[in-house]
Amino acid sequence: FGIATYYGGEIEYRGQDISGWRADQLVNHGIAYVPQVDNVFPSLSVLENLQMGGNSLPKQILNERIERSLEMFPDLRNREYDLAASLSGGERQMLAISRALISDPKFLLLDEPTAALSPLYQQQIIQSIDSLRDRGITILIVEQNARLSLARSDRGYIISNGKVVHTGDAQHILTDPEIGEYFLG
């Protein structure tokens, strides 16, 4: 996504090496990313931010996708003409996820989607993740709150010092006393 410099290695998606691809190539292949850092356009309205997520789409399709994303986050519907700068941190995170969904991704990467959010907004984000999973979207959650991400995952990967130190069934990771005590506290 152009956020970090690509130095080597391989990233494979659906049997294809996507290492070093540009953001537009990733989006065109159904991959969307929501970073941990605030990445909305503060001087644009909520609606304009959503439109930026699909500015190459035909207007009717774009409007349908915006409508679907506003249904997922009703708080945004009530603020669609407000500037993004006026939104709370939780609302900005909902907007960032909504904008990523405009591209109709098949694979969604969420980096710390609930970090520094109030419990109310955390719950709304979690509900949206569950809804997206139920729609068949593959979601990779990078999250320090392992219990939050593992509770809604099929598989879990525990990384320590930059290396995968455990992988397996998410429920097994959550319930195995040795793994849980060591990694989940």
For each feature predicted by the language model, list its residue ranges:
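Glycine-rich phosphate-binding loops of nucleotide-dependent enzymes
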Residues: F1-G185
